[in-house]
Amino acid sequence: RTFKNNDGSALLGNQQMAWLKSALLNSSSTYKIIVLGNQLINAIDGHESYYDCPEERQEIMRFINDNEIPGVLFFSGDRHHSEINVEHHLNYYPIHDITCSALSSPRPKFRGWGKERKLSTRVDNSFITKHNYCVVTVNSDCLVFKFKNKSGRLLFNYSVPQKELGY
């Protein structure tokens, strides 16, 4: 292991970033779902997050905005819990980061919130530490996210209207 250095760090790198930009520019899909191993929006330090790579994170956000690409959402995992974070912007639509990562490895014993208690981007009641999975339903006018426990019982329901994901 080496010390994490935030100067010029990248999760995607040049080749994958070029591919992502091209795919976004050439997509005619209503929804463009980008799946990352780490959260894009959670700004709390001390865990794997795109905030550990600020230049690359900003490059992605700026590219989406500068090119007015509608319908972009991010899916992530690797937190041993599930949650939804939404980052609101003045000049473009809210960016959603749906995290689901607790079906096979839930957070063992949650030892308190620490800095994450004050996470202003988290959607109320979306933080789930028990075994769960998310069912995504794609409709022409909205995306529906249903987080369910391992027995299939609904734990949390969230919808994102398509009209909320555009310019």
Regions found by a protein language model. Give the residues of each.
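Metal-dependent phosphoester/phosphodiester hydrolase catalytic core
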Residues: 1-167
